[in-house]
Amino acid sequence: MAYPLQLGFQDATSPVMEELLHFHDHTLMIIFLISSLVLYIIMLMLTTKLIHTNMMNVQEMEMIWTILPAIILILIALPSLHTLYMMDEINNPLLTIKTMGHQWFWSYEYTDYEDLAFDSYMITTDSLKFGELRLLEVDNRMVLPTDLPVRVLVSSEDVLHSWAVPSLGLKTDAIPGRLNQVTLTSMRPGLFYGQCSEICGANHSFMPIVLELVPLKYFESWSASLA
């Protein structure tokens, strides 16, 4: 989860988020090199006493500033496409969960079970226990198994919402009348927090998301106790 005054991303919890972090660092390095080169050229132009007044057509230079940006764009596009296709890839998910956005709570339905569904509301500040996080805790957490592919179907009952969990690299729009899907695989157990990331009304900031990732045997015990 995020901490006050934190710089950078949250720790990656899924392979997708790791790829996103690598792509971010890769792109940031390219931007840094380009910015350094441009700054160097500007400083050189401002400090040099040499002036070229008869340079009207230099074909070699035109080829360089045409080919070099094309190469840079390819270096950015290739890893970007790899990550994009990785995010959309869904192979034999162990579990499918239908997530519906409402004003202003989430409802979860485990479609592989007959009667495993519940609503998830934010816990108000005056009901928090010691150690719980303000505006981030819910009464019913979404419990999932670790190290296994899970498919999440996202939609909305009323207005636009967005189901987002930053540490897993997830952000999927919840659109009324449309079903979007996303896959997640957690590499470690724990609690992972998110929030609705699409302005959806007066209580938009009171729609937290809490994922509790547990080993498979604990997930089976939890699902058996509720089903």
UniProtKB/Swiss-Prot annotation:
Q: Which InterPro entries match?
A: CcO_II, CcO_II-like_C, CcO_II_C, Copper_CuA, Cupredoxin, Cyt_c_oxidase_su2, Cyt_c_oxidase_su2_TM_dom, Cyt_c_oxidase_su2_TM_sf
* Compartments, as annotated in UniProt: Mitochondrion inner membrane
Q: Which residues lie on this side of the membrane: Mitochondrial matrix?
A: 46-59
Kindly give the membrane topology term recorded for this protein. Answer: Multi-pass membrane protein
Specify the enzyme's EC class, one word.
translocase
Q: Which cofactor does it need?
A: Cu cation
Q: Where does Mg(2+) bind?
A: 198
The record describes how the cofactor is bound as: Binds a dinuclear copper A center per subunit.
Q: Phosphotyrosine modification sites?
A: 218
Primary localization class, coarse: mitochondrion
What's a BP term from Gene Ontology annotated to this protein?
A: ATP synthesis coupled electron transport
Which residues does Cu cation A1 bind?
161, 196, 200, 207
Q: Name one GO cellular component term.
A: mitochondrial inner membrane
Which residues are exposed on the Mitochondrial intermembrane face of the membrane? 1-14, 88-227
- The EC code for this enzyme is 7.1.1.9
**Which reaction is recorded as catalysed by this protein?**
4 Fe(II)-[cytochrome c] + O2 + 8 H(+)(in) = 4 Fe(III)-[cytochrome c] + 2 H2O + 4 H(+)(out)
Keywords of the record: Copper, Electron transport, Magnesium, Membrane, Metal-binding, Mitochondrion, Mitochondrion inner membrane, Phosphoprotein, Respiratory chain, Translocase, Transmembrane, Transmembrane helix, Transport
Where exactly are the transmembrane stretches of this chain? 15-45, 60-87
In which domain of life is the source organism classified?
A: Eukaryota
Q: Transmembrane among the record's keywords?
A: yes
GO molecular function annotation: copper ion binding; cytochrome-c oxidase activity
Q: Where does Cu cation A2 bind?
A: 196, 198, 200, 204
Q: What does this protein do?
A: Component of the cytochrome c oxidase, the last enzyme in the mitochondrial electron transport chain which drives oxidative phosphorylation. The respiratory chain contains 3 multisubunit complexes succinate dehydrogenase (complex II, CII), ubiquinol-cytochrome c oxidoreductase (cytochrome b-c1 complex, complex III, CIII) and cytochrome c oxidase (complex IV, CIV), that cooperate to transfer electrons derived from NADH and succinate to molecular oxygen, creating an electrochemical gradient over the inner membrane that drives transmembrane transport and the ATP synthase.
Tell me the protein family, please: Belongs to the cytochrome c oxidase subunit 2 family.
Per UniProt, subunit arrangement is: Component of the cytochrome c oxidase (complex IV, CIV), a multisubunit enzyme composed of 14 subunits. The complex is composed of a catalytic core of 3 subunits MT-CO1, MT-CO2 and MT-CO3, encoded in the mitochondrial DNA, and 11 supernumerary subunits COX4I, COX5A, COX5B, COX6A, COX6B, COX6C, COX7A, COX7B, COX7C, COX8 and NDUFA4, which are encoded in the nuclear genome.
Task: Please give the name of this protein.
Answer: Cytochrome c oxidase subunit 2
